Design a protein with these regions (language model features):
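Short helix-coil-helix linker/hinge
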Residues: 1-9, 85-93
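Short capping segments at the starts of secondary-structure elements
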Residues: 16-22, 99-107
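Short amphipathic alpha-helical interaction segments
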Residues: 31-45, 113-128
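A short, conserved structural fragment
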Residues: 45-55, 127-137
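Short, Lys/Arg-rich nucleic-acid/phosphate-binding segment
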Residues: 54-60, 66-67, 135-146
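Short, amphipathic alpha-helical interaction segments positioned at domain boundaries
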Residues: 68-92, 144-179
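Short gly/ser-rich loop at a beta-strand->alpha-helix junction or flexible surface loop bordering the NTP-binding
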Residues: 158-231
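Hydrophobic alpha-helical interaction segments
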Residues: 213-308
């Protein structure tokens, strides 16, 4: 997560008239040690917020032009009285991530992995400075601070891209939360926390498929491996067309995937999905349970499926 020091350094760069500053100058301006400043600079570079260049014996730091930095600059310029390092730092960024629309404190705690007590405390702080409002039991960002959620999401998105691109080339993120993301790339990845998924993993469950050169990976600290239930959800997130739905049906039948386990995994992926994963999963479950009688246009005829 981004600490108060990270946001303080960003705020200083946003507020200065110099587009480039040395690490030494930053350390002096912020009254930090050179070692602490170098560490914060390195970590912000990993988030995609800044770039560095070595000139002689000096490391020069400048802001990148990613959208969340531009949005943060607009807010800090117009609302200079707000202590944004205090607002955004630590768990604040995770909480803001899930204020893209109104949510209860319980929902925010569940999605953000921040304790409920901390969520309530941070939301109370945000209410006191007018950034967050509350209607019944639901919290939402007040105008003009709605971009704070966009900033949080943008920062995590760029961090995910940079992390994945350290192990491969061009990527396309299909689904993400603040701490997990599903993406496609063109090469194999062998790194801790990255798990092969999608069509390329079906062979591991005795369903060999003709796949394209693309690879799909899930980056997660939650998983120790990709279960059949996870794989089904990932596949639907990648492509919910008839062919991929049939792949999922084959896997469900071959591995005797329990309906409850699949529904539980679908509920995990649903909040940040661009499609209704739970409804799709229920549709597949009902199709198999009824022997194809409960069939939609996107599912095969039962006899055709049994011949697959």
């Amino acid at each position: 997560m981004l600490s108060k020091s990270h946001i303080q350094l960003l705020s200083h760069l946003l507020g200065t008239t110099d587009s480039e500053l040395s690490v030494t100058s930053l350390a002096d301006a912020l009254d930090w040690s050179p070692g602490h400043t170098s560490r914060i600079v390195s970590e912000l570079k990993g988030w995609g917020c800044i770039r560095t260049e070595t000139r002689g014996r000096q490391k020069i730091v400048s802001l990148t032009d990613i959208e969340p930095i531009e949005e943060l600059e607009e807010l800090t310029t117009e609302y200079s009285h707000v202590d944004f390092p205090e607002v955004i730092a630590g768990s604040g960024l995770q909480i803001l991530y899930y204020l893209d629309h109104s949510r209860t404190a319980t929902e925010i705690a569940e999605h953000s992995s921040v304790s409920r007590a901390t969520v309530y405390r941070r939301l109370d702080d945000l209410q006191q400075v007018g950034i967050v409002g509350k209607s019944t039991s639901r919290y939402q960002l007040n105008d003009p601070f709605t971009t704070l959620s966009s900033i949080a999401r943008g920062l995590y998105h760029h961090r995910h891209r940079r992390e994945a691109q350290r192990h491969t080339g061009k990527i396309n993120i299909q689904w993400e939360t603040h701490d997990e993301y599903l993406f496609t790339c063109g090469s194999d990845i062998e790194a801790d926390g990255f798990y092969l998924t999608g069509p390329g993993l079906f062979e591991a469950f005795d369903i060999p498929l003709l796949t394209r050169d693309q690879r799909y990976y899930i980056r997660s600290n939650r998983l120790s491996d990709v279960t059949p239930a996870d794989l089904i959800c990932h596949t639907l997130l990648i492509d919910d067309g008839p062919r991929y739905r049939t792949y999922c049906l084959l896997l469900m039948e071959k591995q005797a995937v329990e309906a409850s386990a699949l529904q539980e995994r679908a509920a995990h992926y649903q909040p940040e999905a661009a499609l209704d994963v739970r409804a799709l999963v229920d549709e597949l479950i009902e199709y198999l349970e009824t022997g194809g009688e409960a069939r939609t246009d996107h599912l095969p005829e039962w006899e055709a499926f049994k011949r697959t």
